[in-house]
Amino acid sequence: MAKDILKNQDPKLQAMIVEHSAPAPKEIPMDAPVLKRVARPLRHVKFIPIKSLIFHTKTGPMDFSYEKKIKTPIPKNKIVVRVSNVGLNPVDMKIRNGYTSSIYGEIGLGREYSGVITEVGENLNYAWHVGDEVYGIYYHPHLAVGCLQSSILVDPKVDPILLRPESVSAEEAAGSLFCLATGYNILNKLSKNKYLKQDSNVLINGGTSSVGMFVIQLLKRHYKLQKKLVIVTSANGPQVLQEKFPDLADEMIFIDYLTCRGKSSKPLRKMLEEKKISQYDPVEDKETILNYNEGKFDVVLDFVGGYDILSHSSSLIHGGGAYVTTVGDYVANYKEDIFDSWDNPSANARKMFGSIIWSYNYTHYYFDPNAKTASANNDWIEQCGDFLKNGTVKCVVDKVYDWKDHKEAFSYMATQRAQGKLIMNVEKF
């Protein structure tokens, strides 16, 4: 049986097991596999991705979001600006304080900026170009959007925007237009209504606020005010203002509100009665007595708030004078104040009947850069741009933060101790 099986051999299988004399082929050498990073292939992206700083409620945290996008191609009458710097303003905190519920979703921050144009709608190619360095105001408080994001879609017919001059840094430009325009519009209205003249006697409450600093420069350099400015400020305020504006150092008289526990009306009335005031110079550590014979004030500009000066208005403000506040009767509190909230009844009464009941004109001024109520010949955007370009005014920057340090920036602003603008750098995305 076994012999029969061995005889029955398959010649094909037998050929496969025969040992051949030819050597086996050499193994082809191969390098060890190495992973290499390669460029991502081009894709036809139909939107511009955005990184933005947002919040949901006033008590919730601020955080970064990547949900927003700008669709391309952009509208014909709009431009895209890649934001490089953003100026912080108290209105940012007031807007945030108004959101007590998260039902509105993501809320943006930031109202003024500087940056570079990256996209131009086809109808605007005659006026704007890719690469233009610009600055402007992005003010849409009721739309829950802000400019603290990597790119913004701007409508030049609605959003104030200007080319940034070489003499103004990106950080200075980002912190200029909102407060400068506030101050200029106040003074422009006072001048047109004959309240502000070259020989007017002016009191400024809050001289180291950003609006206050711009107003000081405008009054002296643009409106050519002849008399010295009386400025209510903190203990180191005089030193800050004299260092920032050395050409105006002798044009200012200072009242330290801390020495009178916030009741600045007391030293003001004393100055008017005695016709002199004591000024302390911390640098030279000496005290000087200045004569003051100007009498009551023609214009009072309040950037702090409070009722103290108003309560003594009969002894401080001239008949036919003007009192303008950007805050109201209550002292500003950035942690609690809400955007667009009502004044108290007495303030509302003054606004309606002030010129009848009292001897001066009372105005609670709100700056709305998108409002169409201004007169047709009020070209405040171009005028403010010229002020910055020709050096009439300069933005005083207190501190600059990277936007990853946004908690520190907003915490510092909440202390209400900033003496100048707070600027946030926005990284490219």
Curated annotation (Swiss-Prot):
UniProt-recorded Gene Ontology molecular function terms: oxidoreductase activity
Pfam families: ADH_N (PF08240), ADH_zinc_N_2 (PF13602)
Keywords: Cell membrane, Endosome, Golgi apparatus, Membrane
Gene3D superfamilies: Medium-chain alcohol dehydrogenases, catalytic domain (3.90.180.10), NAD(P)-binding Rossmann-like Domain (3.40.50.720)
Subcellular location: Cell membrane; Membrane raft; Golgi apparatus membrane; Late endosome membrane
Tree of life domain: Eukaryota
Biological process terms in GO annotation: protein targeting to membrane; protein transport into membrane raft
One cellular component (GO) term of this entry: plasma membrane
Keyword Chloroplast carried by entry: no
Keyword Membrane: yes
Function: Lipid raft-associated protein involved in the targeting of PMA1 from Golgi to the plasma membrane. May induce clustering of PMA1, which facilitates partition of PMA1 into lipid rafts after leaving the ER and its transport to the cell surface.
Protein name: Protein AST1
Lineage: Eukaryota, Fungi, Dikarya, Ascomycota, Saccharomycotina
Gene: AST1
